[in-house]
Amino acid sequence: MAVISMKQLLEAGVHFGHQTRRWNPKMAKYIFTERNGIHVIDLQQTVKLADQAYEFVRDAAANDAVILFVGTKKQAAEAVADEATRAGQYFINHRWLGGTLTNWGTIQKRIARLKEIKRMEEEGTFDVLPKKEVALLNKQRARLEKFLGGIEDMPRIPDVMYVVDPHKEQIAVKEAKKLGIPVVAMVDTNADPDDIDIIIPANDDAIRAVKLITAKLADAIIEGRQGEDADVAFEADTQADSIEEIVEVVEGDNA
């Protein structure tokens, strides 16, 4: 049984691609049709590729892989943080700092500074410092937490990276590829899939779509770590909606 059903994908709006004028021709094989100026993603492929992504992530997690979730746009930020945390993994959901992976040593120094400031507060150092200095330290901590809080406890560069919208996260993807880190990604019709190891063709602009895919990959990690099926609810009618019905839905929604 597929880890995500056609019905779930439809309800989350995963089938909606970008306007046809904004497409990347390299995504042509993942597009079923065009309706009302919008590309319609071939969800039959999404179902199969989501299965592949699930299996890959599950197996990686079973081997104690460090997995980094990346999604910095507003539609992805909350799901990326919530699901990575639920799976006991790591995330970046604000601006990607150049060199996060390729200059890991420098990033570790910034993380060490974040931990130092937290320790100063816990040990009562803030109580004996001038208010102005404490305010500056709090400002520094807030900024460091915003950009690095999700990887504060990451023990090493990741073994796998999951990305929402590789078109936006091009720098992150390039760093991963430079270091040989496999990338699993939600790829919309405007993106270049060439640098992605496991592509999940999907609408990466809808919050529900991002949440659905991201949660399933978090489930895969949990299953891999536990060595048993995660508590995932599957739809029994996996093939309840055909690709032809998807077109009808799109036409109705864009009427």
Curated annotation (Swiss-Prot):
Transmembrane segments: none
Keyword annotations: Ribonucleoprotein, Ribosomal protein
GO biological process, one term: translation
Pfam families the UniProt entry points to: Ribosomal_S2
UniProt GO MF annotations: structural constituent of ribosome
CDD domains named among the record's database cross-references: RPS2
The protein's name: Small ribosomal subunit protein uS2
Natural source organism: Streptococcus pyogenes serotype M1
Gene that this sequence comes from: rpsB
